[in-house]
Each structure stands twice: as structure tokens, then as C-alpha cells.
């Protein structure tokens, strides 16, 4: 067994991620649709987060490898996608998070991305976990829809044994019958007991997998309710995807927040986060 323990506070430059500190935002778009759109979304997030004093990391995927159809849009691919993300990072001086799907991608992605993300569907794939951990990048581990919160410790142990203690756990909902996800609010506390920063992916928790026959549906109208509920538990951060016109987004539009609503949405969560973390902790054991 590894002697390493997860870092309770994960640091990325001036950004500190911990469950007791002001929340950090991993935000952006689902998949890189075009370079111009990525720049537009990044600039909008950056401007709003500066006004609201929210630490920010830009998120976008270069490839969506688990689409429902062979004909679904997947993105620009590894080479061009990493180039675009690197350009955004350099132009805006903003940290980057993106996901990795295969072991060979881990090293080149980690050269550009500050945080590399382990997809929920792939979170038990040992070769992928080990390759990602060995990059020494911060790893955002998505909780699989089919795993209980307490089972996430096994994935943490794999990363620690591969020599990486810069780990984040991210809730994104649990399978509830067919074509539905629910979020167990008690699961946040279970994962926080593992002494790692815990984030909430409110976007993908709103999915209805396979709900549109050839793609996932979503419940965008309920995003405020779910985000408030999750952030009220006291979390290290929020994962959020937005789009100027979600109904025309090339992936997961039904779950994406309209970009024009981003500032009032985040302002509410900022106020809630400050309130919750100002409460005195009660020992109810």
C-alpha cells in the first residue's frame, strides 16, 4: 500500500481547492465545436468570474468518445484540440481542464492541461488511471454512475499507489433505473471523509441518458434547483457547461446552461457558498 495520502488542499498556482474554502469553478463548454466559439465562451466565463471573485479553470473536451451514434459530433480530436486549448491557455492566462480517454493520451494532454479528467464511464480502467496518475498532473476523478460514493476510495488508492496525491472527486449523478440519474446528497459527505476536494458536476447530473433515442436528453430547467442543493452541502467546487444557444449545441445541449444566464446563476451560488461555509460546524454523531 502507498504511504501517500491525498492532499486535503489541492493547489494550482494561486487557486486553492478544498471543501472548506470558497468554491472553484471548472466551467466552459462540453466539446470544442470551433476555436472561435471556445474563445467566446472562455472570455465570457473569465470576465464573469473576475467580477464575482470566483477562482476559475476553463473546461472543454477535444473528443467525446462515448456518443450514442457513429454519426454524432465528437470534436476536433487530440492534436487540434490540444492546440486550441493551448491557445486559450496562453491568450487568457487561464488554467485548463480536459478529459483523457486512453492511456496514450495522458502524457501529451498533461503537457497543456493543468488538470486532467478521468471520465465516469472509464473510472475503473486501471491502465488509464495509472497512466494519468504518472503524469503528476492534478486529476479530476468523475464518480461513475454505477459506483457508490464509498467505492471511490479504490480509485484514489490506485492513483496514490502510482505516485499521485493531487486528486479531486467529482459527483455527476447515479443511475436510477433506465434513462435517469439522481444525486444522493449524502454521498458528498461520504466522499469528503476521504480528505479530498469534492466537486459537483451539475451539468451531467441533469442528463437523461439515452433520453432522445440517439443522444442524451437533459433537464436544463432544473439546473438552479440541483446546483443550489449540491452546493449547500459545502463543496470545493462546481463543474458547469454553458453554450450561447444550448438547443444548437453539438453535445449535451439539453443539460447546458444558457451563456447569457451565467452571471446571475453564479452570483446566487457564490452567495450560497459564502453563507454555508460561514456556519459553525455541528457535531451530530
Swiss-Prot record:
Its main location: cytoplasm. Keywords: Cytoplasm, Lipopolysaccharide biosynthesis, Transferase. It catalyses: D-arabinose 5-phosphate + phosphoenolpyruvate + H2O = 3-deoxy-alpha-D-manno-2-octulosonate-8-phosphate + phosphate. Pathway: Carbohydrate biosynthesis; 3-deoxy-D-manno-octulosonate biosynthesis; 3-deoxy-D-manno-octulosonate from D-ribulose 5-phosphate: step 2/3; Bacterial outer membrane biogenesis; lipopolysaccharide biosynthesis. The keyword Cytoplasm applies. GO terms for biological process: keto-3-deoxy-D-manno-octulosonic acid biosynthetic process. It is an enzyme of class 2 (transferase). Its EC number is 2.5.1.55. GO terms for cellular component: cytoplasm. It is found in: Cytoplasm. Belongs to the KdsA family. PANTHER family: PHOSPHO-2-DEHYDRO-3-DEOXYHEPTONATE ALDOLASE. This is 2-dehydro-3-deoxyphosphooctonate aldolase. The gene is kdsA.
Amino acid at each position: 500500500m502507498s504511504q501517500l495520502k491525498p492532499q486535503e488542499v489541492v493547489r494550482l498556482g494561486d487557486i486553492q481547492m478544498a471543501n472548506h474554502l470558497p468554491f472553484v469553478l471548472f466551467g466552459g463548454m462540453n466539446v470544442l465545436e470551433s476555436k472561435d466559439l471556445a474563445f467566446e465562451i472562455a472570455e465570457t466565463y473569465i470576465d464573469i468570474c473576475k467580477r464575482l471573485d470566483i477562482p476559475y479553470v476553463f473546461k472543454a473536451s477535444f473528443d467525446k468518445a462515448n456518443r450514442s451514434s457513429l454519426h454524432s459530433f465528437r470534436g476536433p480530436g487530440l492534436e487540434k484540440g490540444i492546440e486550441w486549448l493551448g491557445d486559450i491557455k496562453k491568450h487568457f492566462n487561464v488554467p485548463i481542464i480536459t478529459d483523457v480517454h486512453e492511456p496514450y493520451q495522458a502524457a501529451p494532454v498533461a503537457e497543456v492541461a493543468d488538470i486532467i479528467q478521468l471520465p465516469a464511464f472509464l473510472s475503473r480502467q486501471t491502465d488509464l488511471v495509472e497512466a494519468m496518475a504518472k503524469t503528476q498532473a492534478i486529476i479530476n476523478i468523475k464518480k461513475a454512475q454505477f459506483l457508490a460514493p464509498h467505492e471511490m476510495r479504490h480509485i484514489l488508492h490506485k492513483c496514490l499507489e502510482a505516485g499521485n496525491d493531487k486528486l479531486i472527486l467529482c459527483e455527476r449523478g447515479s443511475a436510477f433505473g433506465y434513462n435517469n440519474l439522481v444525486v444522493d446528497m449524502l454521498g458528498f459527505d461520504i466522499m469528503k471523509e476521504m480528505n479530498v476536494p469534492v466537486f459537483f458536476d451539475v451539468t451531467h447530473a441533469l442528463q437523461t441518458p439515452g433520453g432522445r433515442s440517439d443522444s442524451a436528453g437533459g433537464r436544463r430547467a432544473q439546473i438552479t434547483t440541483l446546483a443550489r442543493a449540491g452546493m449547500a452541502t459545502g463543496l470545493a467546487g462546481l463543474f458547469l457547461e454553458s453554450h450561447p444557444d444550448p438547443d444548437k449545441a453539438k453535445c449535451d445541449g439539453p443539460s447546458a446552461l444558457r451563456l447569457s444566464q451565467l452571471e446571475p446563476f453564479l452570483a446566487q451560488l457564490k452567495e450560497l457558498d459564502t453563507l454555508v461555509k460561514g456556519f459553525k460546524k455541528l457535531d451530530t454523531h
